[in-house]
Regions:
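A structural signal for short, well-ordered beta-strand segments and their strand-loop junctions
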Residues: 1-4, 64
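Short secondary-structure transition/capping segments
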Residues: 4, 39-53, 103-118
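Alpha-helical scaffolding within the catalytic cores
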Residues: 5-19, 41-54, 77-86
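Active-site-proximal loop/turn and secondary-structure-junction residues that shape catalytic pockets
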Residues: 5-9, 33, 68-69, 102
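Substrate-binding cleft of secreted/luminal carbohydrate-active enzymes
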Residues: 60-145
Length: 145
């Protein structure tokens, strides 16, 4: 099972809804950072506590449930943080899901500005991640780009 609550805050804690590690194969949580400009610590602010509590503590893969950014510093900055995380700090981080919709704010990267899409594609396909004690692999390498 993929357990991915909307948000984990002190005013809306998710702990009472945790089904237990024996029932969960992947954990994740939603986060939409709103700071503008986007701080370099946004990824950690969004995910660090949840990751430590549910992914690291039980050695369960972590996949971002839903995210997007519509601040003035642009989607590319947030995409960059999503794909450039230190694998030594987040070794269970396996995936992210982008909220591709123009709703309360414009989160579009595929149907939005072509320059944002181009930046996102470059980051995703040509990003090089170095894991703890492993070689470098880019997503582009995985998809033959």
């Amino acid at each position: 099972m993929y357990w991915s609550p909307n948000v984990d805050t002190s005013s809306a804690p998710v702990a009472p809804y945790w089904p237990g590690a024996s029932y969960v194969d992947v954990v994740g949580v939603d986060c939409y950072p709103t700071s503008s400009p986007l701080p370099s610590s946004a990824f950690a602010s969004c995910y660090s506590n949840f990751y430590k509590t549910y992914s690291a503590a039980y050695d369960i893969p972590f996949a971002i449930g839903e995210t997007g950014y519509a601040g003035s510093s642009g989607n590319a900055a947030w995409v960059s943080q999503l794909v450039n995380q230190d694998m030594c700090e987040y070794p269970n981080y396996i995936a992210a899901s982008w909220f591709e919709y123009d709703k309360e704010a414009n989160f579009l990267i595929v149907e939005g500005s072509s320059s944002i899409l181009s930046s996102a594609q470059q980051l995703l396909l040509h990003n090089t991640k170095t894991g703890c004690g492993s070689g470098e692999t880019s997503l582009g390498d995985l998809f033959g780009e």
